[in-house]
Amino acid sequence: MSDLVSIFLHLLLFKLVAPVTFRHHRYDDLVRMLYKVHNECPHITRVYSIGRSVKGRHLYVLEFSDYPGIHEPLEPEVKYVGNMHGNEVLGRELLLQLSEFLCEEFRNRNQRIVRLVEDTRIHIMPSMNPDGYEVAAAAQERDISGYLVGRNNANGVDLNRNFPDLNTYIYYNEKNGGPNHHFPLPDNWKSQVEPETQAVIQWIRSFNFVLSANLHGGAVVANYPYDKSLGHRVRGFRRTANTPTPDDKLFQKLAKIYSYAHGWMHQGWNCGDYFPDGITNGASWYSLSKGMQDFNYLHTNCFEITLELSCDKFPLQGELQREWLGNREALIQFLEQVHQGIKGMVRDENYNNLADAVISVGGINHDVTSGAHGDYFRLLLPGTYTVTATAPGFDPETVSVTVGPAEPKLVNFQLKRSTPQAAPKRRIPNSGHRGRVLPKKVQPRAARKKETMMKQPQRGPA
């Protein structure tokens, strides 16, 4: 009898969570779908807006967590961003499908999804460029062709060429020495970026994101930093050249995780291009300045890759189900990669959490920092590392850590306040009574000359 009840409840839950239909969703449809998922899974989701587009459309995010709206210490934050280019729409539809899938599988008690939601705070932004999407969708309905129609925002700006250029600073510092992380924004950055870009920058500064992927279209490849080439310009264009980050091996692994879990990306030959293993260094493919994935790596703790997911930027509705089946496992596996490396708390001797402590790994010239709650996350490949935590006013602490291939290693730091060194005693010349310095006696020049002559030996007659 209990088995029949269990089957009935399973079917009831499956029926209540109606799947997202495989069709393109305009802005109003997208908003309805996000709130539909939230209504179906209210205890593990939250819908929030990070700002508005040029045309006033909200940039909505759907959050999945067992405590929506709350950062739990030692629980990593991960994000997906879709539709940055308005006419590259597959990512938008995949993220809607993923949202419904996470909700449905959580309610069906799929233990893999339950564990993912309970141990991770997931943020899904289906569309960063809703204005551009509406232009592209309207053109499709009118059968207007154009490779770039709807790509940019309503001001005609490519949002993936609109972030502050921090690569110049890191390339200089790699050669001459200097900071290797969290490069500051220019003083006038807000006047140089679009509303959508500004909203995303403020968003990623507000959350301690650890891992991210930016979903695009027009090719099928997993692209990892750096995007901007270190090479010299040739005829006004920056020369294509492999430009790795200090975390190059880790980024390659993250890209391969997606590529090999994808239905066909790993095969390499797609859309007339060949990429070994279905991955590429961004600058090795083509150099791109002011891109979002480099900005994430250089300004925050977040490791982001760019996923090019379809040859056709605006695939037909009939192709969406196949694309979803080809990407579903890869989307889940990539989220799970946030649980690797090391993580822990940084505290002082009184167990107060220390924010902005710097976590350095020997041999990797890129540091991360602890968040507002004192927790830090450092993605690493399996191996043995020397890890140091530092904070102003505290003695550094260094430990040796062996990282395995599965769960992240918990490494806490408890920093001791630096003991101020006693200043060496200084000899004070001409010390007089009560510590006063007595001035030297000053003689007139003539008197000094006469005194000198008198001290010289007198010569007798020859």
Curated annotation (Swiss-Prot):
Domain Peptidase M14: 23-338
Pfam name, any one: CarboxypepD_reg
Coiled coil: none
Residues the record marks as carrying a glycan: 402
UniProt xrefs under SMART domains: Zn_pept
Bridged cysteine pairs (disulfide): 41-103, 271-311
Keyword Coiled coil among record annotations: no
EC number(s) per entry: 3.4.17.3
Region (Disordered): 417-462
Annotated residues for binding of Zn(2+): 85, 88, 216
Chief localization: secreted
Cellular localization per UniProt: Secreted, Extracellular space
Stretch forming the signal peptide: 1-19
Annotated catalysed reactions: Release of a C-terminal basic amino acid, preferentially lysine
GO BP terms, alphabetized: peptide metabolic process; protein processing
UniProt keyword list: Carboxypeptidase, Disulfide bond, Glycoprotein, Hydrolase, Metal-binding, Metalloprotease, Protease, Secreted, Signal, Zinc
Function, in words: Protects the body from potent vasoactive and inflammatory peptides containing C-terminal Arg or Lys (such as kinins or anaphylatoxins) which are released into the circulation.
UniProt similarity note: Belongs to the peptidase M14 family.
PANTHER family assigned: CARBOXYPEPTIDASE N CATALYTIC CHAIN, PROTEASE M14 CARBOXYPEPTIDASE
Protein name: Carboxypeptidase N catalytic chain
Organism of origin: Bos taurus
